[in-house]
Every structure is written in structure tokens, then in C-alpha cells.
Curated annotation (Swiss-Prot):
One of its GO terms (biological process) is Mo-molybdopterin cofactor biosynthetic process. This is Cyclic pyranopterin monophosphate synthase. It catalyses: (8S)-3',8-cyclo-7,8-dihydroguanosine 5'-triphosphate = cyclic pyranopterin phosphate + diphosphate. It comes from the Bacteria. Belongs to the MoaC family. The keyword Lyase applies. The active site is at D127. Its EC number is 4.6.1.17. The gene is moaC.
Amino acid sequence: MLLTHLNEENQPKMVDIGDKETTERIALASGRISMNKEAYDAIVNHCVKKGPVLQTAIIAGIMGAKKTSELIPMCHSIMLNGVDIDILEEKETCSFKLYARVKTQAKTGVEMEALMSVSIGLLTIYDMVKAIDKSMTISGVMLEHKSGGKSGDYNAKK
């Protein structure tokens, strides 16, 4: 497989997307944070001293998507049309599953923005309740779906 982020001298470069067609691009990513019952209950009962955890995680996830190109060296800076975040409460496992859907009209995809959104949202939850549970785990951060562009659609295997 040809690595497009390397030049003829095997040095890093940013891929030129200037000749690519502008199309609608959508990416959906997800991830989970698991914690002890005390931390989970504090979040769902709105008893965390730092404020509303899930709402803050949503805002952080949106910010994460917008800042992706500043943190990932070969990622293009693109205008986002929208970032939608959903957080599901999973009481049985004392966990939260965060989904981020990112949409644009661009010459490159938004997979990295969706993955960054999930990661930053989950890290924000960790930050806000680490005083209650330092053993929280973030897992399963993955691309669920992407559409648009030359490579077409992708759906993760269930």
C-alpha cells in the first residue's frame, strides 16, 4: 500500500487535496467510559462539584472536532457543517457511550474529527469525575460509519 503522507525521499508531507471533488462527507464515531457506581451516580444525579458533566462533555466534543487539524499533524483544516453528540447512559455497567456525528461539504473526510470529538468528550468526563474514581477506563473508540469521497461508504462490522 502506498503511503500518501510520504514524499519520494520518504519524508512526511501533507497530501494535496486540491484536485479532489467537493462532496458531502459524514462520519460517525463512538467510544465508552466505564466507572464505579459512585461516579456514575454522581453524574446522573447532577452531584458533581465541577458542574454538569454530560453537557460539558458535549461542548468539549464539539470543540475537539473543531480543533482536530491543530493536534493531528497531517489532518487538513476543514469547515464543519455540524457536529452532533449523543451520550447514552448504561446503568447496568456504570458507563456512558458517546457518539459523535460530524458532517461537512469538503474535499476530504471528517473521520478524524469524529474520532477526536469522541476522545475529547470522554476525556472531559474523566476529568470532571476523577476525584471520585481515578480507575475509570476509556475504551472502544472507533469509526462506526463514514460516507462520501472517493473511497465510498464504510460501516464497522457489528
